[in-house]
Amino acid sequence: MARVAVVVKVYPDDVSIDPKTLAERIKSKLPSGYEVLAEGEEPIAFGLKALKLVIAMNEDTEGGTEEVEQLLKNIEGVQEVEVENVSRMQ
């Protein structure tokens, strides 16, 4: 089964939320079939940092990235999720 790498930008709901803590919370909440391959931070404004993640998932997931977006949005501390890129993994 083919897998895709989804690059997402996760915006925390408060400047006091540590991106590393948020990344660990996300990793612990993702169900099987999803895997965080890479993580980083991107400064936004006024001390707010977005969390950038590369998440591997099955290519044939019904609804495409909608499921992972909803999973992330339902995690405590997440305000918004933006999919930046989706590419097939080899």
Swiss-Prot record:
Signal peptide: none annotated. The keyword Protein biosynthesis applies. Keywords: Elongation factor, Protein biosynthesis. SUPFAM superfamilies: eEF-1beta-like. Pfam families: EF1_GNE. SMART domains: EF1_GNE. GO terms for molecular function: translation elongation factor activity. NCBIfam families: aEF-1_beta (TIGR00489), PRK00435.1 (NF001670). Promotes the exchange of GDP for GTP in EF-1-alpha/GDP, thus allowing the regeneration of EF-1-alpha/GTP that could then be used to form the ternary complex EF-1-alpha/GTP/AAtRNA. Belongs to the EF-1-beta/EF-1-delta family. This is Elongation factor 1-beta. The lineage of its organism: Archaea, Thermoproteota, Thermoprotei, Desulfurococcales, Desulfurococcaceae. The gene is ef1b.
